[in-house]
Amino acid sequence: MKRIILISLFACAALLLGRTEASAWGKLGHSTIGYVADTHLSPKAKAALHEYLDGVTLAAIASDADLFRGQWTLDLGFVPTNPEASRVSFVTTFDFTTPLNISPYSHSITVDENYKCYPTDNLDGAYINNAAYYVDRLAAELKEKADEMDEYERYKAIALIVHLVGDMHCPMHIVYNPVNTIKGHADVIWKGKETSLHSMWDGKLFTAYYDWGFVDMAKLVDTATKKQIREITKGNIYDYASDSARNSWPAVCAYGAGDTLPASYVTDMRPVLFSQLRNGGYRLAAIFNEIFD
């Protein structure tokens, strides 16, 4: 259990003492989602997570998966070598029994032209990135045998759910198949400098005008009524992923490679940013409530 505490406290301390620099949603974004979820856990779920994590919060472990990138998580074929083709055709099989103990938990979700999330990581025989599929499997495992699991594997499952639910609500972690497979990696101009849309959503949108800690950020976004939260948390993980993709599309399609982002980009995207963070938090809480209630 010391390993869990040390990893999580390190991530949490970095958030409290410093500012977000980069990485999926950024540590600030992930911990914001975790904090919103912590606030909306049922008493039973809160008690179970408190026991299993030795009192460490979801906000604190929200970026632990990034500490094990390449071991816990792996996105395959994210950028196709042939820009004319969909990336799913380039990876058909992969052997995960490697010395590094790599697990195929993807940071991204893949949806079709109707924003429907695939309930699999295999599309017509080809691997696709699908964090929702892995969250579904991890949640089922925890619900079935959380008490029987190895301590570290249980922590890993909880931490992965927290992180992957966060990732699937980030617009640049959504693959729109087949029309927009690599948009997040498009280079754009922001304040006279070249950056990527992915980098904007992984941190720059938070730090452009804000100097918040994750607690402050969570309070900014956690504004839905109980009725709205019930609506947001309807359905299952695939419904959540589809809704996330639908809500994110305006942000994804607004600008492309070579575009100069306007000075108003941060405020233009703020409604999407805030709604995705709050929805991710509410849904993360709903997943754990369903597992442990």
Task: Cite the ranges covered by each PLM segment.
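Sec-dependent N-terminal signal peptides
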Residues: 4-13
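N-terminal, motif-rich segments that launch catalysis or mediate targeting to/interaction with membranes
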Residues: 23-164, 171-293
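C-terminal segment of classical bacterial N-terminal signal peptides
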Residues: 14-21
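Positively charged n-region of N-terminal signal peptides that target proteins for export
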Residues: 1-4, 19
